Amino acid sequence: MTAATQPATPAAPNNNEPVRVNHTARNVIITIVVVAIIAVAAFFGYRAFAGANESSAKGSKGNPVKIGVVGATNPEWVKFKQDAEKAGIYVDIVDFQDYTSENPALDSGELDLNEFQHLLYLANYNVSNKKDLQPIGGTAIYPLGVYSTKVKDIKDLKQGDTVTIPNDETNQARAIGVLKAAGLVTLKGYWTAFSTPAYIDEAKSKVKVTPLKAEQVATTLKDPTIAAGVINNDYVAD
């Protein structure tokens, strides 16, 4: 299997992106759909999927396939594990609170696979860290949304409001694309897959942007000084 390669830079989002509003018991969720196909990544090197005998073979009861995810208790993983065992493959779903730890864990041999990232994130990780993790398949398509407990409609955000976004390089750029599509920020030039807050023209933008670790963005919605946050699907809970 060949090494992961840098995918083509996606086109800049436009102001006609669909906006979906989902009212829940605890939160008003304002979702601007900027999707990513989540890839399953693996490291094929000195570790092999099969051992010398059946008792130690990778996928056996004594040596399950370890898959790193965020949200191991989600219903889909319970069903996946059950179906895998019916097929004779034992799986250990390893939960991570911080998805930035998953690729290092895969590279070190703590995991056999992980499932959390889109291809751009994986390619950027490989290039930045001189690694060779392999994408072996796509699993799901997730939106990146704007969430708020303060307003019911994205149009209700006020001039000067603060919006938090993930600070990892590729998801930060996606979040900026979401805010641009919603008309909340104006960029100094074109949006790219590696746009940073430095690309934002603060004087012409409606909101202020604060980058934080992805797992912290959702908790900022409880802060009275934060109007909204762009939250990765892994950290969204009703």
Model-derived regions, located:
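Short, low-complexity disordered leader/linker segments with a strong preference
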Residues: 1-64
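Immediate post-signal peptide segment of exported/extracytoplasmic ligand-binding proteins
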Residues: 48-66, 84-86, 153-161
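Short, polar/charged alpha-helical segment
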Residues: 64, 70-95, 101
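Short helices/loops that flank or line small-molecule/ion binding pockets
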Residues: 82-83, 100-112, 177-178, 197-230, ...
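Short beta-strand-to-loop elements that line the ligand-binding cleft
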Residues: 91-98, 188-194, 206-213
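Short beta-strand-centered segments that line the small-molecule binding cleft or hinge
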Residues: 111-114, 132-138
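Ligand-binding "clamshell"
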Residues: 124-136, 151, 238
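A conserved helix-loop-strand patch within extracytoplasmic ligand-binding domains
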Residues: 136-185
